[in-house]
Amino acid sequence: MDNIQTFIKESDDFKSIINGLHEGLKEQLLAGLSGSARSVFTSALANETNKPIFLITHNLYQAQKVTDDLTSLLEDRSVLLYPVNELISSEIAVASPELRAQRLDVINRLTNGEAPIVVAPVAAIRRMLPPVEVWKSSQMLIQVGHDIEPDQLASRLVEVGYERSDMVSAPGEFSIRGGIIDIYPLTSENPVRIELFDTEVDSIRSFNSDDQRSIETLTSINIGPAKELIIRPEEKARAMEKIDSGLAASLKKLKADKQKEILHANISHDKERLSEGQTDQELVKYLSYFYEKPASLLDYTPDNTLLILDEVSRIHEMEEQLQKEEAEFITNLLEEGKILHDIRLSFSFQKIVAEQKRPLLYYSLFLRHVHHTSPQNIVNVSGRQMQSFHGQMNVLAGEMERFKKSNFTVVFLGANKERTQKLSSVLADYDIEAAMTDSKKALVQGQVYIMEGELQSGFELPLMKLAVITEEELFKNRVKKKPRKQKLTNAERIKSYSELQIGDYVVHINHGIGKYLGIETLEINGIHKDYLNIHYQGSDKLYVPVEQIDQVQKYVGSEGKEPKLYKLGGSEWKRVKKKVETSVQDIADDLIKLYAEREASKGYAFSPDHEMQREFESAFPYQETEDQLRSIHEIKKDMERERPMDRLLCGDVGYGKTEVAIRAAFKAIGDGKQVALLVPTTILAQQHYETIKERFQDYPINIGLLSRFRTRKEANETIKGLKNGTVDIVIGTHRLLSKDVVYKDLGLLIIDEEQRFGVTHKEKIKQIKANVDVLTLTATPIPRTLHMSMLGVRDLSVIETPPENRFPVQTYVVEYNGALVREAIERELARGGQVYFLYNRVEDIERKADEISMLVPDAKVAYAHGKMTENELETVMLSFLEGESDVLVSTTIIETGVDIPNVNTLIVFDADKMGLSQLYQLRGRVGRSNRVAYAYFTYRRDKVLTEVAEKRLQAIKEFTELGSGFKIAMRDLTIRGAGNLLGAQQHGFIDSVGFDLYSQMLKEAIEERKGDTAKTEQFETEIDVELDAYIPETYIQDGKQKIDMYKRFRSVATIEEKNELQDEMIDRFGNYPKEVEYLFTVAEMKVYARQERVELIKQDKDAVRLTISEEASAEIDGQKLFELGNQYGRQIGLGMEGKKLKISIQTKGRSADEWLDTVLGMLKGLKDVKKQTISST
């Protein structure tokens, strides 16, 4: 927005600051500006001086806002945010990697000599970092043609925070497989694969972490640290020495033996972890021991950097608060015997600033003296925030009149092209003339403009006669930005949950549930093969050859339930399977009957979209996700058909289901039909009512609400309106199902969370459903597999992508302590937010709420639990929703439904006792707005955790690191979804055979009834040849990857797929050995054999025999087959067995490669030996 900056640059105030910089003044103060006006001033300084700028704010939230502004204003400069959580205790907790990746990116860019604009909260400056030279020496440049010693590289990677794994799927991991090294730098979008020829780097390629395939070839790669803690051998030795002397000094200060014992045990444990080479977060507390002189972030910035302190008095207040919190935190750790007495955790911000040689510029809203500052130049700018118009255009028109009289230049900003056009038409409606312009064109004094651009807030600068108005002031709702691309996209795409781990339960289709013990290579009659080793009841074991891998599935049942192992060869599994089969057949019958009824019934076919519909949709202030757009398209297509719609729309709370439903409602109202939206609770009704009222405000649509919050008079008016057709859309609880509610012409029924209505209500819903279009919304994920099997029974649309929001929820797993809770709550309240405190024990929830009130006396604390009456619960929730209470202590009832964007901190008590899926859903309750949200999963101090709880906490830790926890959560939710869809009684059946087998059985039963069985049966060839065809341990070590590859071999259906798999294996694992080559040969044989319907390829003592199916044999021309065989001389024998052709190929005295060539040659040639069919003309 260069043209807005020009106004600032031409002012005397700006020139005064620039002169001060030229004259070498150490400190200057700029007062009077706030919000985005400050950002415009900063961007003008950046452009004018062309110097790097380091801007410090009081907290992270403010730093984000400033970063967003500067990114919009400075298109040609890189603006970086250095995000640090202000809570000192969270520093040493296990934390999510996204913010760390951003911090590392900033440090790497600074050490590589870039001169960006960096924005950081004061907490970032207090933080200790490795000295700059240590960081620089930790950068590794790897180039093609250079030599690398894999073991040395592995040691260095571990020193700088990387973790070794079997397969690289998340940032911060590396793996070494023979001459192939995969590394996922934290600051790269994709991981890299380095291939060695002996020790020389032969090639470097980036690859996709999902399918592990290469993307592009590189000539070099710079690998920076994966953590901010770098521990080389010399640092380790220094720290060990200091820990020993610190421990001796601390033990002297303690009186009680018990205390000494605890301290000694804890510190010894830390030393052990340090000597093992661990670099986890908990060792961060020893940072001052590792380095002679730790660095601050400012030490990394170029010498000519201009330092700006944004609202300097607030920064000093925050510094005091941080010092106080840190002192309390250290006191707590000292009491617990977890820290030494002389440890420093951070720098003093004031001291660092005082030591700076660089020029300082202070921003302050008011002109006043601030402690610790002595500015030599003070500039007071006349400026004010733009007032909010909240859609009241008559107020804006009055303001515009004032601007015109004073000869102001006015700029309206719209987020994108569509928004600027919308702005133009809105202003024209109120006779406000505005010219379209862009940020490069000069502005003429006294004119009104519309321009594409985004700022956090508008402002007015009276002396410069400039006013900037954003959509934030014009309309109530803020337009969401398209975020800057996150670096961690690939890590979030998580592999299918069906991957097998050793110790998992599995289901064999013929033998039942067993425990998977790994993959083993066995030698039988001199032939090597890989087998899955499955343990059954007692000491029974089953070895399943990998070619039968599709008969084994991972067992997925309800979370926390251990399945029973079956006895091999027993009849119990057959009995259980039979029972489930019968139940599945019944369900399939019901579903097919339902399907036939739906197809036969006649409804109303809505007309295609018209201009008004398109206009209504373009007024949506956010960016739709692809899933939203697809769902909208599917729903409209259904509505335009004559058959009544029955569609389920699935998506988590806050994923944008409501907007999809609103568009469907608008379409129905456009055709003169009425719409009813049925919701389970009064609060949800209220929320939907507010949303719909706001979305429909520019259209002549009459909206009714029927709930406990309406007076009798209001309710009667709505009921009357529904009967005579004056009410177009009604939102209501089960009150809508009462006998007195009659519609003139209902066209669309929208049901939110149908599973939360009781049986009697569901019956009434069925009656209304009969001939109207029905859209059901649910937040419980419905499994895709089940959806496939139910295709055509109930249509399903799924919204799986969350709305684009810049910051993922920062998740911490940490011991519970009062100081942490107080800090987290106070921090959230300080930024105007609210807190969920999850406490899952109804009996003493009141006591817990009182405890929190005592911890944070300023907070208004409320509590809610499931044993309250519906009315009590709704009253509490409503007052929380309206901001009358700050902290809600609640049981898991907050899992569902109500969306409160202002809640951005979640604290979970006893997280180890909760299901992963619950934790995942709870975590989804925060982080709905454009702020960083925090989730603290706490467990009780010094509690011995059960093995299950420990595993669960481990999984939560993994899922803070974007690991597999997400998959487990989705899996459990999926099962719940299945239960909801099919009825609760199915839960037991799903558990008894596992979810995947159940889905498969249901799918087959439905296809059988639809007559689709012929389509699903594929011709299978059985191949039994004596070849060492397997994946040796030396080629792929990891069992999971082996299984994955065997599955891929099994699914090869064409020669193209075989070739692709060959390329992929060479790409991922290097050149393959003979044993793997034989696997490819067998796969190729199978492709041709299937095409020519060869039933069996079997090797006996001296030949390989091919048996061709009866139908295929009948099509073969004997003469042509004889000629084909002659090409191979005496090695081929031909004969018939009944009506089936048999071909035998000699193996005696020939190498495997020779007879394989002949087998392949004969199989390929079969397509050319068919009888000619003479077409009749």
UniProtKB/Swiss-Prot annotation:
Subcellular location: Cytoplasm
Domain Helicase ATP-binding: 638-799
Matching SMART domains: CarD_TRCF, DEXDc, HELICc, TRCF
Phenotype of the disrupted gene, per the record: No visible phenotype. An mfd deletion suppresses the lethality of pcrA DNA helicase depletion and increases survival of the strain in the presence of H(2)O(2) but not methyl methanesulfonate, although the surviving cells are very small.
Motif (DEEQ box): 752-755
CDD domains xrefs: DEXHc_TRCF, SF2_C_TRCF
Family per similarity comment: In the N-terminal section; belongs to the UvrB family. In the C-terminal section; belongs to the helicase family. RecG subfamily.
Reported function: Couples transcription and DNA repair by recognizing RNA polymerase (RNAP) stalled at DNA lesions. Mediates ATP-dependent release of RNAP and its truncated transcript from the DNA, and recruitment of nucleotide excision repair machinery to the damaged site. Probably required to repair non-bulky DNA lesions.
PANTHER family registered for this protein in UniProt: ATP-DEPENDENT DNA HELICASE HOMOLOG RECG, CHLOROPLASTIC
Name of the protein in question: Transcription-repair-coupling factor
Organism the protein comes from: Bacillus subtilis (strain 168)
